[in-house]
C-alpha cells in the first residue's frame, strides 16, 4: 500500500467499519493479557515506562491499516469495551478511549491521514506514551523519586513509545499489508 492516501478516499464504507471492528476485536483480545502484564510490571517503576508503549500499539496499528479519520477513536472504543469485563481496571478502561485515543487522532489529523512513514509512526507512539507517562508519573509517585529516576523514566517513555507503540505498529502493519488481506 502506498504511504500516501488519496484525499478522495476519506469516507468510511461498511467494509472499512467491519475491518476496523474485526481488527479491534482481535487486538482487544491480545490487549487483555498485555494489560495484566503491564499491571504486574508497574511494580518496577524504572522498567515500566519502557514497555508502556506496548499497550498503545493496537489502535495505532489499526490506524496504520485503515487510514481513515476517526479510526483511532473507534478502534480504541472497541478495544477498551472488550477489556472492561476481562481486566482489573474494569470501567476505567473506557476513560482511556479519549485519554489516549484523542491525542493519537490529533497526531494523525495533523498528518492528514497521509503520513505513515516510520518517523511519523514513531512520533505517534511517543505522543501517546508521553500522555500515558504523565498519568503514570503522577499516580505512581515518580515525581517524588530521585531526579535520575525521573530522567530515566522520561527517556524510557520516549524510546518505548517510539519502538513499542509506533514502530511495532509500522512493522506489523507492513507485514499485514504485504499479505493483501486489507485490500
Per-range role (PLM):
Residues 61-74, 110-119:
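Membrane-helix interface "capping/anchor" motifs
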